[in-house]
C-alpha cells in the first residue's frame, strides 16, 4: 500500500484538517496528496473509507451504495450491474469522405471528446475524432474534430456547417485526444463550451493541450492557453463539488508507462498552462503522481504476459459522487497488432470517488466489454467519453467508442455505440428474508425521503437516533411498506408522517429492511417531486439546465 509522504516531500508539514467537503470528508492540508510512486501494481488508497466522518451530510444528491462509506452494518449482498448494449449499434459511424485518413482509415467516434445533452437547445450533442486525410496530408494518420446532434440520443445527424468546406467539421487542428466540456455552471456565455484539445505543436510535432472557448460548441475561438509538451492520451474533467478543473495525464512509472498524473486548478486556463511532462526525480509544484494500474486488472487471454495499463481516465460528477471511467489496456503493443491485423484490447471499467482524487473500484470486470465477433463495431479498443452518462428518464445512457477489425488499417474503423443502465443502477444491495442495512450517522436539511428500489417482496425504512434507538413515529412498524414495486424514485412515508422535516437538525441513522428486494440509492429532497440536488452528469431531457437535479423551472 502506498504511504502518504507528507513529511518526506514537504518538510515540517502537519496534516491539519482544512477543507471540509459537502459530505463531511476532511481534506488534509497537503492537497492534492503526494504519494510515493510504487514499485508494483496496486490499488489506489481510499482514506475516507478507512476513517469516515463522524457525521455524513446527505444534502447533495442521491446516495449510492457503490462503496462502504454510508454503511455501518448490513447483511445484504452487493450486486454489481453492467449496462445493456443498444441492439442497433453503432449509433454513429464513418460514412463521409472527409472522415478518412490519407490511407483510407475510417474514424467517427469520440476519443474522450464529449457527448452532452444541452437543455437550453433541447438536443443531444456529440464531438468526435474524424480522419483528416483530406486536409492534413503530411502523415498517414491525422485527425480533426467533427460534430453531430440528435433528438433522442439514438439517431444522429451530421449537420452541414459553415466552418470548413460545408462539412460537419468544427475544428481543423491536427489532434489526438480532446475534451469538450459543456460547462453548465459557467456564467460567461462565450465560455459555456470548453475544448481542451491535444494538438500537434507545429514547431516540433509534440503534443500539447490548447484551451478554446465557444458559445455554441460549433464556432470556436482561438486558443487562450497552452500547455508544455504532453503524452498524447490525456484528458480533463471538472469537479463541481470542489470547483476545480483536473487534468488526467498519461504518466510513466516503474510499474507502467500507462499510469496517470494529476493537476488541479480553479482556473481552467491556469490548469492548462501548468501542464507538462514530468522529469523523473524532480518534484513539480502543481503536478503529482496519481495512480498505476491495479494488480487486479484483467489480462488479455491471448497475451497473458502483457502487463495491463491505464490507457485513459475520464471522470464526471454523478449525483453525490465522482464517477471514474477507466480505459484499461490489455495489449498487445502496436507493433504486434499491426503484424497480426488486430485491435489492441481496451475495455471500460468504473470507479467512484467522494473527494475527486481517491477512486474506489468495487469490480474488476468490464463495465463495457469488447465483442470479439467478426463484424462487431466494438471488436477492440473501446474508449470512454466525456459527458457520459446522460440521464434519460429512468435510464442512464453510456456511450463509448469501439473499433472494428478491418483490412484497411489495423488501428482504424472507429464508431460510436450506446449502452443503457437503470438510473443509479451501478450497484444494488440485495436482501432476501431478514435483510437489513444500517447507515452511518447522517445529517440532512431536506424533507422527503426517497429510495430507488426494485421490490419484489417488501421494503421498510426505520429512522433511528445517533445511538441507534428507533424514533417514535418513524419505526419499522409505523412505516408504510413498499411492496412489489420497481421505481427509480419512491417516496417513503409512515402512518403519522409524510416526511421527516420534524427531524431536521438531528443526527439520524436509517435502517432499511429488505425482503426479496434491491435498493440502489436513497436521498432526502426539499421537494415532494423528489429532485435530489445532485449533479446530472451530461444532462438529459426535462432536467435543469444548471446541471443540478432541481425543479426545471428553478
Language-model-derived ranges and their functions:
Residues 2-12:
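Bacterial N-terminal signal peptides
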Residues 17-311, 316-379, 393, 399-554:
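Beta-rich carbohydrate-recognition and catalytic domains
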Amino acid at each position: 500500500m502506498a504511504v502518504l509522504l507528507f513529511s518526506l516531500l514537504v518538510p515540517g508539514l502537519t496534516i491539519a484538517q482544512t477543507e471540509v467537503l459537502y459530505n463531511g470528508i476532511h481534506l488534509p492540508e497537503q492537497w492534492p496528496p503526494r504519494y510515493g510512486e510504487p514499485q508494483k501494481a496496486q490499488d489506489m488508497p481510499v482514506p475516507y473509507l478507512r476513517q469516515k466522518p463522524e457525521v455524513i451530510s446527505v444534502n447533495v444528491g442521491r446516495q449510492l451504495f457503490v462503496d462502504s462509506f454510508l454503511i455501518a452494518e448490513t447483511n445484504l449482498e452487493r450486486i454489481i450491474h453492467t449496462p445493456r448494449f443498444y441492439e442497433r449499434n453503432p449509433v454513429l459511424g464513418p460514412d463521409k469522405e472527409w472522415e478518412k485518413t490519407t490511407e483510407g482509415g475510417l474514424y467517427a467516434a469520440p476519443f474522450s471528446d464529449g457527448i452532452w445533452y444541452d437543455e437550453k437547445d433541447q438536443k443531444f450533442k456529440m464531438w468526435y475524432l474524424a480522419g483528416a486525410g483530406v486536409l492534413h496530408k503530411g502523415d498517414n494518420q491525422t485527425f480533426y474534430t467533427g460534430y453531430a446532434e440528435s433528438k433522442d440520443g439514438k439517431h444522429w445527424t451530421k449537420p452541414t456547417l459553415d466552418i470548413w468546406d460545408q462539412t460537419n467539421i468544427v475544428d481543423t487542428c491536427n489532434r489526438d485526444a480532446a475534451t469538450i466540456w459543456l460547462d453548465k455552471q459557467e456564467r460567461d456565455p462565450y465560455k459555456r463550451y470548453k475544448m481542451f484539445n491535444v494538438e500537434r505543436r507545429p514547431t516540433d510535432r509534440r503534443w500539447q493541450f490548447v484551451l478554446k472557448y465557444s458559445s455554441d460548441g460549433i464556432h470556436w475561438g482561438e486558443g487562450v492557453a497552452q500547455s508544455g509538451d504532453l503524452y498524447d492520451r490525456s484528458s480533463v474533467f471538472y469537479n463541481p463539488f470542489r470547483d476545480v478543473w483536473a487534468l488526467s495525464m498519461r504518466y510513466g512509472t516503474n510499474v507502467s508507462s500507462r499510469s496517470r498524473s494529476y493537476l488541479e486548478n480553479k482556473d481552467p486556463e491556469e490548469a492548462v498552462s501548468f501542464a507538462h511532462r514530468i522529469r523523473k526525480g524532480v518534484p513539480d509544484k502543481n503536478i503529482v503522481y496519481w495512480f498505476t494500474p491495479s494488480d487486479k486488472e484483467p489480462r488479455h487471454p491471448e497475451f497473458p504476459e502483457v502487463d495491463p495499463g491505464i490507457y485513459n481516465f475520464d471522470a464526471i460528477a454523478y449525483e453525490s459522487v465522482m464517477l471514474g471511467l477507466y480505459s484499461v489496456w490489455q495489449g498487445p503493443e502496436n507493433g504486434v497488432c499491426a503484424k497480426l491485423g488486430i485491435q489492441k484490447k481496451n475495455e471500460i471499467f468504473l470507479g467512484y470517488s467522494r473527494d475527486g482524487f481517491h477512486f474506489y473500484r468495487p469490480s474488476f470486470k468490464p463495465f463495457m466489454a469488447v465483442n470479439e465477433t467478426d463484424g462487431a463495431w466494438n471488436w477492440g479498443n473501446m474508449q470512454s467519453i466525456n459527458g457520459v452518462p446522460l440521464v434519460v428518464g429512468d435510464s442512464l445512457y453510456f456511450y463509448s467508442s469501439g473499433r472494428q477489425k478491418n483490412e484497411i488499417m489495423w488501428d482504424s474503423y472507429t464508431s460510436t455505440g450506446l449502452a443503457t443502465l437503470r438510473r443509479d443502477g451501478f450497484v444494488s444491495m440485495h436482501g432476501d428474508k431478514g435483510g437489513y442495512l444500517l447507515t452511518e450517522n447522517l445529517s440532512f436539511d431536506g424533507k422527503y425521503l426517497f429510495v430507488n428500489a426494485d421490490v419484489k417482496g417488501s421494503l421498510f425504512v426505520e429512522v433511528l437516533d445517533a445511538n441507534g434507538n428507533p424514533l417514535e413515529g418513524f419505526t419499522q412498524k409505523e412505516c408504510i411498506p413498499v411492496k412489489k414495486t420497481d421505481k427509480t424514485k419512491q417516496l417513503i412515508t409512515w402512518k403519522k408522517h409524510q416526511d421527516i422535516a420534524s427531524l431536521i437538525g438531528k443526527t439520524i441513522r436509517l435502517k432499511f429492511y429488505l425482503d426479496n428486494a434491491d435498493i440502489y440509492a436513497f436521498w432526502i429532497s426539499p421537494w415532494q417531486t423528489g429532485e435530489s440536488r445532485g449533479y446530472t452528469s451530461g444532462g438529459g431531457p426535462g432536467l435543469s439546465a444548471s446541471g443540478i437535479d432541481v425543479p426545471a423551472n428553478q
